[in-house]
Regions:
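A short alpha/beta connector and helix-capping loop motif
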Residues: 24-26, 41-69, 74-80
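Active-site-adjacent betaalpha module
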Residues: 1-27, 35-36, 64-72, 96-233
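Short acidic/His/Gly/Ser-rich catalytic and metal-binding motifs that mark active-site loops
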Residues: 36-41, 87-88
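Short, well-ordered beta-to-alpha junction loops that form the rim of enzyme active sites
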Residues: 79-82, 160
Length: 233
């Protein structure tokens, strides 16, 4: 089921870090759009439902945002989550993954085909890809350096999963003094028992303390408004 939640009824969005946007100082980061989460046949597939998109549907919505951002001159980076095959860098992740996948599965291990970025994604070869074994795309990577070197102020975050890597990346973006924007229709979460609870709570946490939560259509409207403002100046 595609995204169909009413954010205004679920999240208090009055306080914003990005009431307007400057595309020239904006960056798009695509988090963990890997086969394990996006392929309906994969071990970690995110099924969605109850108004939130599936991993497969996020491929479509994320590509739509990627294409529009490129039209606005916004650069794109990517990240992938995974651990070494022997688990030597996994830390506490292995303790948690046993709960997620009680029947096993090697989807999060480098070298497994499921760990690769979904080939349907509109990724260009020259765009940076950051690999790490922890939730935040900033931790142990060069993402912060790319953003600061390009004088970025606004960081759009899309991808998987909402309550894990997207939320943690948005938090670290705020910690580094960027203005994070998470697109609710371009992410989804693991909620095997709680329906939309983890997804909504993660978005509330981002909006309440770190950044802004909106839909891709709302973002595109901001792009259009920025053009009108620039033309009138």
């Amino acid at each position: 089921m595609p995204f169909s939640l009413d954010l205004e009824k679920l999240i208090d969005r009055k306080c914003r870090v990005a009431p307007t946007i400057d595309p020239a100082r904006t960056w798009l980061h695509v988090t963990d759009m890997q086969v394990t989460c996006t392929d309906p046949k994969a071990s970690g597939y995110l099924k969605g439902g109850y108004g939130i998109p599936s991993g497969d549907e996020c491929v479509v919505s994320c590509n739509r945002v990627i294409d529009r951002c490129r039209q606005e001159g916004i650069r794109v980076s990517w990240s992938m989550f995974g651990v070494e095959p022997d688990g030597s860098d996994a830390g506490l992740f292995l303790d948690k993954v046993r709960f997620w996948y009680p029947n096993g599965g090697s989807d999060a291990k480098w070298g497994d085909p499921e760990s690769e970025i979904d080939p349907r994604m509109h990724r260009r070869p020259e765009e940076p890809v950051f690999k790490r074994p922890v939730p935040s795309a900033f931790f142990g990577t060069m993402l912060n350096r790319y953003l600061t070197s390009n004088r970025i102020e606004y960081l759009i975050v899309v991808g998987l999963s909402t309550s894990y890597c997207v939320r943690n990346t948005a938090i670290d973006a705020s910690n580094y003094n960027f203005r994070p924007i998470v697109l609710a229709d371009c992410t989804t979460a693991y909620d095997p028992y709680e329906k939309t609870a983890g997804y909504v709570e993660a978005l509330r946490n981002v909006q309440g303390q770190y950044g802004d939560v909106m839909t891709s259509d709302e973002l595109f409207k901001m792009f259009d408004e920025a053009k009108h403002t620039h033309a009138a100046a």
